[in-house]
Regions:
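Conserved AAA+/SF3 P-loop NTPase catalytic/coupling segment centered on the Walker-B
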Residues: 138-161, 174-175
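A broad "ordered helical/assembly scaffold" signature
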Residues: 77-88, 153, 163, 174-178
């Protein structure tokens, strides 16, 4: 599997241990990247409010201008970017219509890469066939879930780090731990 300390970009990797960007190397074992071209920060004094003003406006709006909430939203997005499922497996994004939930989802998808993202529902997590769409994905979206009536065995197995049966169409069944 991909080392957790590397974030794959189109033009290289960001090494979190070294706190530096560098070129791709075969020994990194990266199978994919997020599709974003990494650019170096403009200066030591770069800040969101000035250099990413539209993002900052959305962040302020989504957090109700609460600095603590803004930090938690940024932490959640960093967790998605760095694929840190060991910190938290699930983020539940709630709020009224127009509060920024969909924007968060779109930013998270951008940071992960569309090819690394899958969308489904709780029922899909409970069936071996339904789980097949999530294999190899680093971001699973379960948008606007209606009332779920089921056992929740799939989500329990994922959070417990258990092996899950996968039954992809026209493929041999196998087991995997989804992270």
């Amino acid at each position: 599997t991909q080392p957790r300390y590397l974030i794959g970009f189109k033009n290289g990797v960001y090494d979190l241990r070294e706190n530096a960007f560098r070129a791709h190397k075969p020994e990194d074992w990266l199978l994919n990247h997020n599709g974003i071209t990494f650019t170096q920060p403009l200066a030591a004094n770069e800040c969101l409010e000035v250099h990413a003003s539209n993002f900052y406006k959305w962040l302020s709006h989504a957090a109700g201008r609460d600095a603590g909430k803004m930090e938690r939203i940024k932490a959640g997005l960093f967790m998605v970017l760095a694929n840190r499922s060991d910190w938290q497996l699930f983020l539940e994004i709630t709020g009224e219509g127009g509060s920024g939930k969909s924007v968060f989802t779109h930013i998270a998808t951008l940071l992960t890469g569309e090819h690394n993202t899958a969308s489904g529902n709780m029922a899909a997590l409970d069936s071996a066939r339904g789980r097949a769409q999530f294999v190899g994905k680093s971001l699973i979206l379960l948008p606007d879930q209606s009332k779920y009536v089921g056992e929740g065995t799939g989500i329990k197995a994922i959070t417990g780090g258990d092996l899950l049966e996968i039954d992809g169409k026209y493929e041999k069944q196998f087991s995997i731990i989804l992270q």
